[in-house]
């Protein structure tokens, strides 16, 4: 589970359209314009 400034939205987007080529950390930054803080 990823938690970020927009955690719930980002995680839902990742679950709906996962990108196997990228790690979860890289994928979540795509949904956070600031590339903001997150924890795994």
Swiss-Prot record:
Question: Does the keyword Manganese feature in the UniProt annotation?
Answer: yes
Q: Which UniProt keywords apply?
A: ATP-binding, Biotin, Fatty acid biosynthesis, Fatty acid metabolism, Ligase, Lipid biosynthesis, Lipid metabolism, Magnesium, Manganese, Nucleotide-binding
Judged by the first EC level, this protein's enzyme class is ligase
Does the UniProt entry include the keyword Protein biosynthesis?
no
Pathway-wise, it operates in: Lipid metabolism; malonyl-CoA biosynthesis; malonyl-CoA from acetyl-CoA: step 1/1
Ranges for domain Biotin carboxylation: 1-40
A Gene Ontology biological process noted in the UniProt record is:
malonyl-CoA biosynthetic process
ATP-grasp domain mapped to chain residues = 13-27
Q: Give the reaction(s) catalysed.
A: N(6)-biotinyl-L-lysyl-[protein] + hydrogencarbonate + ATP = N(6)-carboxybiotinyl-L-lysyl-[protein] + ADP + phosphate + H(+)
In alphabetical order, the GO MF annotations are: acetyl-CoA carboxylase activity; ATP binding; biotin carboxylase activity
Q: What is its EC number?
A: 6.3.4.14
What does the UniProt cofactor note say?
A: Binds 2 magnesium or manganese ions per subunit.
**Names of the cofactor(s):** Mg(2+); Mn(2+)
Q: In terms of domain of life, where is this protein from?
A: Eukaryota
Q: How does it assemble?
A: Acetyl-CoA carboxylase is a heterohexamer of biotin carboxyl carrier protein, biotin carboxylase and the two subunits of carboxyl transferase in a 2:2 complex.
The free-text function statement in the UniProt record for this protein reads: This protein is a component of the acetyl coenzyme A carboxylase complex; first, biotin carboxylase catalyzes the carboxylation of the carrier protein and then the transcarboxylase transfers the carboxyl group to form malonyl-CoA.
Q: What is this protein called?
A: Biotin carboxylase
Supply the source organism for this entry. Answer: Populus euphratica (Euphrates poplar)
């Amino acid at each position: 589970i990823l938690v970020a400034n927009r955690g719930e939205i980002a995680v839902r987007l990742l679950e709906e359209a996962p990108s196997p080529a990228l790690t979860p950390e890289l994928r979540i930054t795509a949904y956070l314009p600031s590339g903001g803080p997150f924890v795994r």
